[in-house]
From Swiss-Prot:
Binding site for ATP: 8-18
Sites where the protein binds Zn(2+): 188, 197, 200, 203
Keywords for this protein: ATP-binding, Ligase, Metal-binding, Nucleotide-binding, Queuosine biosynthesis, Zinc
Catalytic reaction(s) noted: 7-carboxy-7-deazaguanine + NH4(+) + ATP = 7-cyano-7-deazaguanine + ADP + phosphate + H2O + H(+)
GO molecular function annotation: ATP binding; ligase activity, forming carbon-nitrogen bonds; zinc ion binding
Protein name per Swiss-Prot or TrEMBL: 7-cyano-7-deazaguanine synthase
Enzyme type, top EC level: ligase
Encoding gene (name): queC
Biological pathway: Purine metabolism; 7-cyano-7-deazaguanine biosynthesis
Lineage per the UniProt record: Bacteria, Pseudomonadati, Pseudomonadota, Gammaproteobacteria, Enterobacterales
């Protein structure tokens, strides 16, 4: 039996990964992390989506220690979430240092326990906010370290790594779940489900990608298929 663990936040990217994993694996587990993030709604949305989409199990892990160590606008109410600014330089205040290091490591431990061969994460280099822990080289390096440390060939999969946001929308549409992604996920840094606040960087990327996809569906669907190998 093929099993996978999806690092699951209930946002657009991880939900798209879950939808695809449910078609490609016999058994899919979701793991969500409570790190004292700004909006508890993220966890509630993830739980509802995992159940409605048909995940085998959904585990919520308490990692609130990260909140004590990582200062970010996603972990501190006193730090405002910035609006989208295409000219901003440096790491945005929404970067949570060490988050993906911790999440992927803990997801690998969970994968070990449920005998899953893959840990799936929705990180992406094409449309990202400069986060260093979303880079392909980081994921591959950590995968190598985790496999050595566990003496087990767990595989990190990054289905969205080379897709832009329009192509990520196309992938959801390919699996017949575009409306689920649009209306039921929570990507907004201000904690608003669906189309979100429309002002933060996450909402900007999401809305811009959807507009691009709707403007040229055939070409973008074809590009997505070419990158992913889907027929």
């Amino acid at each position: 039996m093929k099993r996978a663990v999806v690092v699951f936040s209930g946002g657009q990217d991880s939900t798209t990964c879950l939808i695809q994993a449910l078609h490609q694996y016999d058994e899919v587990h979701c793991v969500t992390f409570d790190y004292g993030q700004r909006h508890r709604a993220e966890i509630d949305v993830a739980s509802a989506l995992a159940a409605s989409l048909g995940a085998r199990a959904h585990k919520v892990l308490d990692v609130t220690l990260l909140n004590e160590l990582a200062v970010s606008s996603l972990t501190r109410d006193s730090i405002p979430v910035p609006d989208y600014d295409p000219d901003a330089e440096g790491l945005p205040s929404t970067f949570v240092p060490g988050r993906n290091i911790l999440f992927l490591t803990l997801a690998s431990i969970y994968a070990y326990q449920v005998q899953a061969e893959a840990v799936i994460t929705g990180v992406c280099e094409t449309d990202f906010s400069g986060y260093p822990d979303c880079r392909d080289e980081f994921v591959k390096a950590l995968n190598h370290a985790v496999a050595l440390g566990m003496a087990r060939d767990v595989r990190f999969e990054t289905p969205l790594m080379w897709l832009n946001k329009a192509e990520t929308w196309a992938l959801a549409d390919y699996w017949g779940k575009l409306d689920v992604i649009r209306h039921q996920t929570l990507t907004c840094y201000n904690g608003i489900q669906g189309d979100g606040c429309g002002e933060c960087a996450a909402c900007h990327l999401r809305a811009n990608g959807l507009s691009q996809y709707e403007a040229d569906k055939p070409a973008i669907m074809a590009a997505m298929k070419q990158k992913t190998g889907l027929k």
